[in-house]
């Protein structure tokens, strides 16, 4: 125990309902001299608190969605905004998943659903109410995890910043972004199998040939045109949020990312009173 706990500032113990198990352990550790406490009502009480507070925070905060077809560097934009001190929730990061059929390439396994919800709450609670929170356009499912209902409802019809770029630039970006994955042919074949019900047999044969030939440009281009772009366009058709800015680029995605971030910061888009 000393090896695990000595460096901790404060220990918080809990069991399912906050009964004898956690209280007994708290007594022992307190007698040792550790600074510790018990969650009243146990984990069940904590879960109720997380759900209720997430709902309240979701309704009281204002969000802007960074939207755009796959390969526009939306996650890069969020990361850059966060590095510049803006409020960002990287849902894909919290879910340890890239939110697409290639999402499983991240080595870290996805958290449990309850841990994912706690991650969202812990991120939300630290934000200032007078500033916008930036999120990426997502479906409600990220891998095997589901975005909490009230949080998803709050962001679904939020204001939008839309990024457009030519497909050749998006293809180049995806090849660089997934460079390690592109070398793992077995993983590619496994994931492409998930598309068999969504695209034709002829297209699947073409994709398999591109993989075998290591023609990653054609592979990425085909995946965009056959699946990703259509999926994004369908999802955007259902959204009712106000479009506050659309960027139409014909440049490297990295340059577009820098431009969008600079625009947001220079124009104080992150301040709630701006709109």
Language-model-detected regions and their locations in the chain:
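Helix-loop module immediately N-terminal to the HCX5R catalytic loop
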Residues: 1-10, 48-53, 185
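Catalytic cysteine-centered active loop of the rhodanese-like fold, especially the PTP/DSP P-loop
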Residues: 1-40
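Hydrophobic/aromatic beta-strand patches that form the interior of the parallel beta-sheet core
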Residues: 12, 37, 64-66, 87-89, ...
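Glycine-rich phosphate-binding P-loop
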Residues: 20-21, 62-83
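A short glycine-rich beta-strand->turn/loop micro-motif centered on a GG-aromatic cluster
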Residues: 34-48, 90-95
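Glycine-rich adenosyl-nucleotide cofactor-binding module
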Residues: 40-66
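Conserved nucleotide-sensing/catalytic segment adjacent to the nucleotide-binding pocket
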Residues: 83-154
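Conserved NTP phosphate-binding and transfer environment spanning the P-loop NTPase/kinase superfamily
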Residues: 154-159, 164-275
